[in-house]
C-alpha cells in the first residue's frame, strides 16, 4: 500500500512540475492596440490559446508549432494576416481556416506539409498573398487548390528537392496574378498548358536547375506573361529549336537571368530564343557566370531581327572565369545597333572595343560603374564615331585619376550631356579642362577633391560635388540650376551672385554654423534648400529668423528634424525650432548697456547723496580715526609740548589771538598754547598735524560758536581729532562757548560733540566785563587740572 501511495505522489509531483515549466502560450504574444500580435521566435510548440476577434495580424514564424486544429483560429474572424513560416507544421485540419474569410495574407512556407488540401483555402475568398514555398510536397495535390481564390495576386509554390511535377489542373481558376514564384529546381514532368490557364501574369520567377522544360513552360506563358525571371539555371546544355514554338507574338517585355550559368554555345541558343519571340524590350543578367571565351557562333546573323527590338541591356556582377582570354565579341556587334540603354556593372570591364562602340549607334545611356576603366583604355572606347547618340555616361567607381585627360577623352562624344565620374580618385583639379560642349550634368561626388576651379564647365545645369574636402565654393556658373555639395567642409552658403539661376541647393553635413534671411533672399530663384546636419550656433538672430519665417519650411525640405543646435552647450542636440533662449542671452548688448547706465546713475546718486549728507566727510573722518587708532593711545609725558591745543574757527581768530593768547601766554606762569596758524609744521599733512598737536597737548580747547560749526575747517579737518579724543573717554577737552548755540544748529555728524555738550560743563564767554576775570580764572584752573 505504501508503494502505491509513493508512486502516486511521484506522478503528481512530476505532473505539477511539468505544468510549472510549460510556458503560458497566450502570454508569449505581444499585441498592440490595433490588434497586431507578434509571437516570433518564442519557442512555441502549439498555437496560442485565447485568440479573439480583436486580432488583426498574427505572426508566429520561427517557432516549433507542428499542428493546427479546427478550433485554434475559430474566433479570429477579423484576421487579415497570418504568418506561420519556418515552423515544423505537418498537419492542418480541414476546417482550421474556416472562419478566416477576411484573411488577405497567409504564409505557410518552410514547414513540413507533404500534402496540400484544397479545403484549407476554400473559405479564404479575400486572400491576396499565399506562400507555400519550402514544404516537402511532390505536387500541388489531386484537386485544384486555388480555384476559389479569385482575389489572389501573389502566389509562391514549390521546393528545392521534392517538387517534381506541375499538372494541368494546378493553377485552374487563377485568371490574373501580379506575381507568381515557382521553385521547380528538381522539376521532372510538366503537363502541357498547365500554366496557360492564367490569362495574365505580370511577373514570374522560375527556379529550375535544368532547362529541359524551359521552352515548353515559356510557350504556355508567352501570351500572358510580361516579365520572366529565370533563377539558378544551368544553361550550359540549353539548345533552342524553332520547331518547338508555334506562336511568335508574345507579351513578354522583360527577361531576367539571375544566377544562371551560360556557355558560348548556350548563349547562342538564348539569342535565338530572344529573336524568335517578338516584343522583348529589356534583358537583364544578374550574378551570372559565362563559361567561355566569347566565341559566339551565331549563324545567319543577318536573319536575326526581333532581338533588335531590345532597348535595354543590364549586366550586373557577371563572372567570366577565363576573362583575360576573352574574345572581342565581334560576332554579336551587329545585334547591338538598336540598343538604347546598356548597364554593365561590377563585371571587371576595362575596355569597350572601338569597333563595338561604333556599332552602338542608338545608344543613349551607358553605365560602366564599378569596373576597371582608366583614361588610356577609355580613349580607345570613346574613339572617333563611337557612341554617336550617347547622352549619359556613367563611369562611377572606376580607376580614373585625371580630370583633364578624362574630359579630353570624351570630346569625341558630341551629344554627351550627362557625365557621372563619381567615386574615382582625382584628388586635385586643374585650372582649366575641356569637356563636350553640350555638358549639362556632372557628378564629381566622392572624388577626394580639395577645391573646385575653372575646370568645371560653365554650361552645367546640375553639379554634384558632395562628399569631398571642399571648404570654399566660389565658381561662377551662370546656368547652374541644381548644386549638390553635402558632406564637405564649407562654413557658409555659396555666393548667390555667382549662381543666379539656382533652384536646388543641398549643402547638408558641412561646417555651416548659421545663415541669415539676407543670404537666402539673395538666391532669387531658390526653391529647395537642404542644409540639415550642420553644427548650428543657435544665436538669438538665427533662432528668430528660422522660427518666425513660416515660409521657410517650404524651402527647407529637411526641416525641422535635421536642424539641431551645436551651441550654446545647454541646448546642444535640440531641434532649432524648439529652442528658446533667455532674455539675457538674446539681449546681452542692451543688458550690458542698461547695467552701465544703472551703474552710472548709481554713482551719480551716490555722489549727490554724499554731497547732501556729507558722506565724504564721514569717510575722511573714518580714515583719520583708523590712522589714529594705529598710534599709541597717549604720548609719553616727555613728548607733551603744549598745555593746550586750541581749535577754533577763522572767524573767531581775533578773540583767540588778541584775548585768549594774551591772557594765557602772558600769565605768570605762562601757558604754552598750540595754534594751527603758528605751530603746524609746513608741508605735513594737516590731519597728521592736528592729531600730533592734540597728542602733544595736555588739553584741547574748543572755541565754540556759530562760525565753528559752519566752518569747513572744522567740518573736514579738526573734527577728526575730536573723534579720537572723545573716543578715548578723556577729560582733556575744554569747551568755551563764545556765543549761545542752539543744539539744532549743531550738525548731526558732530554726534560726539553734541553728546559732550549734554554731559560736560562748558565755559561761557560773558559779555559783561566784570565777569570776564572770573572766566579767565576758571579757564586757567581747567587747564592746570
From Swiss-Prot:
Q: Does this UniProt record's set of keywords contain Membrane?
A: yes
Where in the cell is the protein located? Membrane; Cytoplasmic vesicle, Phagosome membrane; Membrane raft
Q: Which InterPro entries match?
A: Cys-rich_flank_reg_C, Leu-rich_rpt, Leu-rich_rpt_typical-subtyp, LRR_dom_sf, TIR_dom, Toll-like_receptor, Toll_tir_struct_dom_sf
Highest rank taxon of the organism: Eukaryota
Report domain TIR positions. Answer: 640-783
A GO CC term attached to the entry: membrane raft
Numbered residues of crosslink Glycyl lysine isopeptide (Lys-Gly) (interchain with G-Cter in ubiquitin): 755
Disulphide-bridged cysteine pairs: 31-37, 354-383, 433-455
Tell me the residue ranges located in the Cytoplasmic compartment per UniProt: 611-785
Q: Does the keyword Chaperone apply?
A: no
Stated role: Cooperates with LY96 to mediate the innate immune response to bacterial lipoproteins and other microbial cell wall components. Cooperates with TLR1 or TLR6 to mediate the innate immune response to bacterial lipoproteins or lipopeptides. Acts via MYD88 and TRAF6, leading to NF-kappa-B activation, cytokine secretion and the inflammatory response. May also promote apoptosis in response to lipoproteins.
What family is this protein classified in? Answer: Belongs to the Toll-like receptor family.
Note the subunit structure.
Interacts with LY96, TLR1 and TLR6 (via extracellular domain). TLR2 seems to exist in heterodimers with either TLR1 or TLR6 before stimulation by the ligand. The heterodimers form bigger oligomers in response to their corresponding ligands as well as further heterotypic associations with other receptors such as CD14 and/or CD36. Binds MYD88 (via TIR domain). Interacts with TICAM1. Interacts with CNPY3. Interacts with ATG16L1. Interacts with PPP1R11. Interacts with TICAM2. Interacts with TIRAP.
Protein name per Swiss-Prot or TrEMBL: Toll-like receptor 2
- Organism for this UniProt entry: Canis lupus familiaris
Taxonomy of origin reads: Eukaryota, Metazoa, Chordata, Craniata, Vertebrata
- Gene name per UniProt: TLR2
Amino acid at each position: 500500500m505504501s508503494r502505491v501511495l509513493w508512486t502516486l505522489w511521484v506522478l503528481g509531483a512530476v505532473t505539477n512540475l511539468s505544468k510549472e515549466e510549460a510556458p503560458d502560450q497566450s502570454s508569449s504574444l505581444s499585441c498592440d492596440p490595433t490588434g497586431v500580435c507578434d509571437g516570433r521566435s518564442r519557442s512555441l510548440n502549439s498555437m496560442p490559446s485565447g485568440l479573439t476577434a480583436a486580432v488583426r495580424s498574427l505572426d508566429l514564424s520561427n517557432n516549433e508549432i507542428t499542428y493546427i486544429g479546427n478550433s485554434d483560429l475559430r474566433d479570429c474572424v477579423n484576421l487579415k494576416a497570418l504568418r506561420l513560416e519556418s515552423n515544423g507544421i505537418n498537419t492542418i485540419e480541414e476546417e482550421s481556416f474556416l472562419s478566416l474569410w477576411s484573411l488577405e495574407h497567409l504564409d505557410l512556407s518552410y514547414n513540413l506539409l507533404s500534402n496540400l488540401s484544397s479545403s484549407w483555402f476554400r473559405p479564404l475568398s479575400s486572400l491576396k498573398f499565399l506562400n507555400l514555398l519550402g514544404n516537402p510536397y511532390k505536387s500541388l495535390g489531386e484537386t485544384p487548390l486555388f480555384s476559389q481564390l479569385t482575389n489572389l495576386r501573389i502566389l509562391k509554390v514549390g521546393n528545392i528537392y521534392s517538387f517534381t511535377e506541375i499538372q494541368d489542373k494546378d493553377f485552374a481558376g487563377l485568371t490574373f496574378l501580379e506575381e507568381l514564384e515557382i521553385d521547380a529546381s528538381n522539376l521532372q514532368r510538366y503537363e502541357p498548358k498547365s500554366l496557360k490557364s492564367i490569362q495574365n501574369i505580370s511577373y514570374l520567377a522560375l527556379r529550375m536547375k535544368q532547362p529541359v522544360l524551359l521552352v515548353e513552360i515559356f510557350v504556355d506563358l508567352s501570351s500572358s506573361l510580361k516579365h520572366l525571371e529565370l533563377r539558378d539555371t544551368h544553361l550550359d546544355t540549353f539548345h533552342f529549336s524553332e520547331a518547338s514554338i508555334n506562336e511568335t507574338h508574345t507579351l513578354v517585355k522583360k527577361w531576367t537571368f539571375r544566377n544562371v550559368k551560360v556557355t558560348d554555345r548556350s548563349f547562342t541558343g538564348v539569342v535565338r530564343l530572344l529573336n524568335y519571340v517578338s516584343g522583348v524590350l529589356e534583358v537583364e543578367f544578374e550574378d551570372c557566370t559565362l563559361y567561355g571565351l566569347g566565341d559566339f557562333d551565331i549563324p545567319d546573323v543577318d536573319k536575326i531581327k526581333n532581338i533588335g527590338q531590345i532597348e535595354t541591356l543590364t549586366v550586373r556582377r557577371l563572372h567570366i572565369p577565363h576573362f583575360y582570354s576573352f574574345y572581342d565579341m565581334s560576332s554579336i556587334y551587329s545585334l547591338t545597333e538598336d540598343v538604347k540603354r546598356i548597364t554593365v556593372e561590377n563585371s571587371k570591364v576595362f575596355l569597350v572595343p572601338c569597333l563595338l562602340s561604333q556599332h552602338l549607334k542608338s545608344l543613349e545611356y551607358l553605365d560602366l560603374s564599378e569596373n576597371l576603366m582608366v583614361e588610356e583604355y577609355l580613349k580607345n572606347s570613346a574613339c572617333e564615331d563611337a557612341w554617336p547618340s550617347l547622352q549619359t555616361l556613367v563611369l562611377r567607381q572606376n580607376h580614373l585619376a585625371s580630370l583633364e585627360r578624362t574630359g579630353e577623352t570624351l570630346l569625341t562624344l558630341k551629344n554627351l550631356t550627362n557625365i557621372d565620374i563619381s567615386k574615382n580618385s582625382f584628388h586635385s583639379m586643374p585650372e582649366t579642362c575641356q569637356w563636350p560642349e553640350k555638358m549639362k550634368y556632372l557628378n564629381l561626388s566622392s572624388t577626394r577633391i580639395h577645391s573646385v576651379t575653372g575646370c568645371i564647365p560653365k554650361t552645367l545645369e546640375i553639379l554634384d560635388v558632395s562628399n569631398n574636402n571642399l571648404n570654399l565654393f566660389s565658381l561662377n556658373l551662370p546656368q547652374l540650376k541644381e548644386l549638390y555639395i553635402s558632406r564637405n567642409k564649407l562654413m557658409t552658403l555659396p555666393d548667390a551672385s555667382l549662381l543666379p539661376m539656382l533652384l536646388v541647393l543641398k549643402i547638408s553635413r558641412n561646417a555651416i554654423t548659421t545663415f541669415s534671411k539676407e543670404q537666402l533672399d539673395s538666391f532669387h530663384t531658390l526653391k529647395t534648400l537642404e542644409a540639415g546636419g550642420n553644427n548650428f550656433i543657435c544665436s538669438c538672430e538665427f533662432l528668430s529668423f528660422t522660427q518666425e519665417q513660416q515660409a521657410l519650411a517650404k524651402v527647407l525640405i529637411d526641416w525641422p528634424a535635421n536642424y539641431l543646435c551645436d551651441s550654446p552647450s545647454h541646448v546642444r542636440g535640440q531641434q532649432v525650432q524648439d529652442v528658446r533662449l533667455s532674455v539675457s542671452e538674446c539681449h546681452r548688448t542692451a543688458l550690458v548697456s542698461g547695467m552701465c547706465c544703472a551703474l552710472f546713475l548709481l554713482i551719480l546718486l551716490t555722489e549727490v547723496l554724499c554731497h547732501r549728507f556729507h558722506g565724504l566727510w564721514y569717510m575722511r573722518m573714518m580714515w583719520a580715526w583708523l590712522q589714529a587708532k594705529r598710534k599709541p593711545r597717549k604720548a609719553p609725558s616727555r613728548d607733551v609740548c603744549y598745555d593746550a591745543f586750541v581749535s577754533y574757527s577763522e572767524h573767531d581768530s581775533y578773540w583767540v589771538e588778541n584775548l585768549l593768547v594774551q591772557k594765557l601766554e602772558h600769565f605768570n606762569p605762562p601757558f604754552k598754547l598750540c595754534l594751527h596758524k603758528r605751530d603746524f609744521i609746513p608741508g605735513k599733512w594737516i590731519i597728521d598735524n592736528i592729531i600730533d598737536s592734540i597728542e602733544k597737548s595736555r588739553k584741547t580747547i574748543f572755541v565754540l560758536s556759530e562760525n565753528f560749526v559752519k566752518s569747513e575747517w572744522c567740518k573736514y579737518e579738526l573734527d577728526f581729532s575730536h573723534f579720537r579724543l572723545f573716543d578715548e573717554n578723556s577729560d582733556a577737552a575744554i569747551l568755551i562757548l563764545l556765543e549761545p548755540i542752539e543744539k539744532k544748529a549743531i550738525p548731526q555728524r558732530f554726534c560726539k560733540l553734541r553728546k559732550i555738550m549734554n554731559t560736560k560743563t562748558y565755559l561761557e564767554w560773558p559779555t559783561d566785563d566784570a565777569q570776564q576775570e572770573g572766566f579767565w580764572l576758571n579757564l586757567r584752573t581747567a587747564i592746570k587740572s
